[in-house]
Amino acid sequence: MNPQLSPKAIREIREGTCNPLGAPQVTTDLSENIILTSLDDLHNWARLSSLWPLLYGTACCFIEFAALIGSRFDFDRFGLVPRSSPRQADLLIVAGTVTMKMAPALVRLYEQMPEPKYVIAMGACTITGGMFSADSTTAVRGVDKLIPVDLYLPGCPPRPEAIFDAVIKLRKKVGNESILERKKTEQTHRYITSDHEMNLVFSENTGEYLNKTSAKVISSSQKEKITELPEKTEITNTEKD
């Protein structure tokens, strides 16, 4: 080291060698040290990256959604955690045909989900009934006749990339919501399901059906004889001869 350098110059050389960026200086500006936000933005920011879907797949559209679980698409990066119980889910993905007999079960699952909750109608069969509604009287022609739908995803079936696009659009909707205006969209009434209570009723098996004409035993004289059998006496006489 050059002995002609002053101690101050030597100190500056050492600081520049050990820490080229220099010592960080804390600014006194308020905007550089405090994050200002609203309660709506903070609440929505926490929810839009933690959507927990309930997968309600009934037909071939669900196969495309199952492809998202693999490593090629990896839907976990969006914070999607599939749930098997509606009480821990806030997103209902309906994929496939919904029949009249299945409609009360779907509505009951939707009612068991806590607020706020969202619904994605995936596929043509879910949105309009699809090809199964052409000749069938039991297919529901649009799941929005049963439950409110937040996002429609057309296709037969939709590609996994389209499902990603639907999730991104739903995240934008969640990010623009307001806590004060949420009561306008909350569910205030039940849909087509009734109270699931067990009531004691009288037995319907009273035996009256046995008195019907169709339940009576047909006599042997009224039965149609297919083959005329010979009498037993005739058989014995032929054996003796």
Curated annotation (Swiss-Prot):
Chain positions covered by the region annotation Disordered: 220-241
Matches recorded under InterPro entries: NADH_UbQ_OxRdtase-like_20kDa, NADH_UQ_OxRdtase_20Kd_su
Cofactor note: Binds 1 [4Fe-4S] cluster.
Assigned GO CC terms: plasma membrane-derived thylakoid membrane; respiratory chain complex I
Compartments reported by the entry: Cellular thylakoid membrane
Phylogenetic lineage: Bacteria, Bacillati, Cyanobacteriota, Cyanophyceae, Synechococcales
Matches recorded under NCBIfam families: nuoB_fam, PRK06411.1
Name of protein: NAD(P)H-quinone oxidoreductase subunit K
Organism: Prochlorococcus marinus (strain MIT 9215)
Name of the gene this protein is made from: ndhK
Role this protein plays: NDH-1 shuttles electrons from an unknown electron donor, via FMN and iron-sulfur (Fe-S) centers, to quinones in the respiratory and/or the photosynthetic chain. The immediate electron acceptor for the enzyme in this species is believed to be plastoquinone. Couples the redox reaction to proton translocation, and thus conserves the redox energy in a proton gradient. Cyanobacterial NDH-1 also plays a role in inorganic carbon-concentration.
Key words of the record: 4Fe-4S, Iron, Iron-sulfur, Membrane, Metal-binding, NAD, NADP, Plastoquinone, Quinone, Thylakoid, Translocase, Transport
Domain of life: Bacteria
GO biological process, alphabetically ordered: aerobic respiration; electron transport coupled proton transport; photosynthesis, light reaction
SUPFAM superfamilies: HydA/Nqo6-like
Reported cofactor(s): [4Fe-4S] cluster
Principal EC category: translocase
Subunit structure: NDH-1 can be composed of about 15 different subunits; different subcomplexes with different compositions have been identified which probably have different functions.
Catalytic activity: a plastoquinone + NADH + (n+1) H(+)(in) = a plastoquinol + NAD(+) + n H(+)(out); a plastoquinone + NADPH + (n+1) H(+)(in) = a plastoquinol + NADP(+) + n H(+)(out)
Residue ranges, compositional bias (Basic and acidic residues): 222-241
Enzyme Commission code(s) on record: 7.1.1.-
Similarity remark: Belongs to the complex I 20 kDa subunit family.
